[in-house]
Amino acid sequence: MNDYVPTTALTAESATTSIDVPTASTSLLTDMYELTMLQGALESGTATRRSVFELFGRRLPGSRRFGVVAGTGRLLDAIEAFTFTPDQIDFLHRTGVVNDETLDFLRDYRFSGTIRGYAEGECYFAGSPLLTVEGTFAEACILETLALSIYNYDCAVAAAASRMTIAAHRRPCVDFGARRAHELAAVAAARASVVGGFVGTSNLEAGLLYGIPTVGTSAHSFTLLHDTEEEAFAAQVASLGPGTTILVDTYDIATGVERAVKAARAAGGELGAVRLDSGDLVAEAFKVRAQLDALGATSTKITVTNDLDEHAIAALGAAPVDSYGVGTKLVTGSGRPTAALVYKLVEREGADGTMEEVAKFSSGGKSTVGGRKWAGRILTAEGTAAEELVVSSGSQDQGLAALDEAGARPLQVLL
């Protein structure tokens, strides 16, 4: 696809689909204290105590009213690859990170517990138990950093994408953030953007891994390469066809629009779209739409880029724009680059073998609520989400029964 106006719809579910690719070990994508805690627990005899960890946010970043779950599929893949290779064991031994007993445990490490969580694309609020990890303390504790690393970034991007998609009022939004982030983060951002409602990406690696439709045609450098703008546009149309999207603001926008339409018609077709990347986008969109219509190019679409966020997109709502390309603000969470999620122990096995609720008490808003949580969504008769109910219960049967009694749809699924 070479058009900036994608025609292929993509769902949050399809963003979790990937091809089989070799995955390197993820076990050292963690903080050192995860392993030193493991060592201490092995020495104190508490490492095998059954434990329940929850991943949640104490509050939402800024003044935002909801978050969007993303990263679940990536985390499950990362946990599958969470094994310690001989080279990694050697590194931990040489640097004295942990002792030999702990290294023996890590050599054979495979997560064998259970994980429940919200499906990708679900909205959430402060306190929502997005992920519940149950296993021994040893095997569940050391997943903390990895889980937070993936969820904090992916949820931040998905929330930003959702806000932008809402502001766009059904006009398609496309990820252009590859050059504005770490090369691997950009791939994750492309995936999360689709969970949040975007319909395509410029990132080819994301297209390969996740089946996301890819878009892209040319930059200003392609126009500058040629001796004239006419030659550049003719070359692009000859290569990509008249349905391509041409960037028309390298020199004069009005002249660029006229030349782009002419180049497409010389090839026997109508121009697919023009892209605006500078200036007052609202004013320019009105001018360009009027010019295209006057030229008879009524089917030619207008796509805009240039440091867009949800506020800029909302400001363009009345303008005759057909699609948006978003880069920097998307991959940085539109000013909130982390979802501010935490991973806390909420229940653990006591010395007598019974499960006990545990919680952190402290000032400064960093306390936690003990006990395993079960969450459900209550819908109106019209199917609109009205509220989220969270109940604390150590028993799955009791937790689900409480949700059912309130008429709430359970949000956590076995992953």
Model regions and ranges:
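An N-terminal, globular interaction/scaffold subdomain
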Residues: 76-82, 117-120, 124
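Short, conserved beta-strand edge motifs with alternating hydrophobic and charged residues
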Residues: 247, 275, 303-305, 325-327
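A residue-level signal for beta-strand positions that form part of recognition/binding surfaces
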Residues: 52-54, 112, 173, 342, ...
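A structural detector for beta-sheet-dominated domains
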Residues: 56-58, 118, 392, 414
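Extended boundary segments
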Residues: 40-98, 166
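Gly/Ser/Thr/Ala-enriched C-terminal appendages of enzymes
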Residues: 2-49, 63, 294-295, 300, ...
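Buried, small/hydrophobic-residue-enriched core segments of structured protein domains
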Residues: 2-49, 59-61, 97, 103-112, ...
